[in-house]
């Protein structure tokens, strides 16, 4: 079942092998996403188009929107915000090297409530170690084992972040 509460985006520039794994991790969970190709090499842009043959994947080539050289993260965020508002959905940003687990996005959606602007997933590497900027969590790990939500004033990464429609 494709979720209708999220407009999911993934900015990509080359690194197609890991990006393809990240894309399929989202689609395999029943979600659709929009991949923003930020001026990848021609063969990589072509591979993204081949991947987009799946009806749950749309590829937007930034070169069709601007001639500004990469990175174009601001433009991607502006376009995505506008689309999420049109669709009345939350905006979810997933970086192209983040392989989500099956329940991650549903768990993030469960945290959306009035007054919450952002919900971020703490990402880990393949060995289960916290990724930067979450290194400080290893010292506090025992405190978080029983909590679904961690209120933090520390920095967080946009590696896998949901921006609520209310915030947009």
Language-model features and meaning:
Residues 157-168:
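Conserved nucleotide-sugar donor-binding
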Residues 119-133:
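Short beta-strand-to-loop element that shapes/binds the nucleotide-sugar donor at the catalytic cleft/hinge
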Residues 88-99:
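Short beta-strand-to-loop acidic/aromatic patch adjacent to the donor-nucleotide binding site
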Residues 122, 134-154, 158:
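Short, flexible, basic/aromatic active-site loop/helix in glycosyltransferases
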């Amino acid at each position: 079942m494709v979720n209708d509460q999220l407009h999911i985006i993934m900015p990509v520039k080359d690194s197609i092998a890991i990006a393809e794994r990240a894309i399929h991790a989202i689609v395999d969970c029943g979600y659709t996403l929009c991949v923003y190709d930020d001026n990848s090499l021609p063969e990589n842009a072509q591979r993204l188009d081949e991947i987009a043959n799946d009806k749950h994947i749309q590829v937007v080539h930034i070169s069709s929107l601007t001639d500004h050289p990469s990175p174009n993260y601001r433009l991607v965020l502006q376009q995505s915000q506008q689309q999420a508002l049109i669709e009345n959905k939350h905006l979810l940003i997933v970086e192209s090297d983040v392989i989500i687990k099956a329940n991650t996005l549903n768990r993030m959606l469960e945290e959306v409530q009035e007054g919450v602007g952002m919900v971020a997933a703490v990402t880990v590497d393949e060995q289960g170690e916290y990724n930067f900027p979450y290194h400080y969590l290893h010292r506090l790990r025992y405190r978080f084992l029983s909590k679904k939500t961690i209120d933090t004033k520390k920095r967080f990464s946009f590696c896998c972040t949901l921006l609520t429609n209310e915030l947009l």
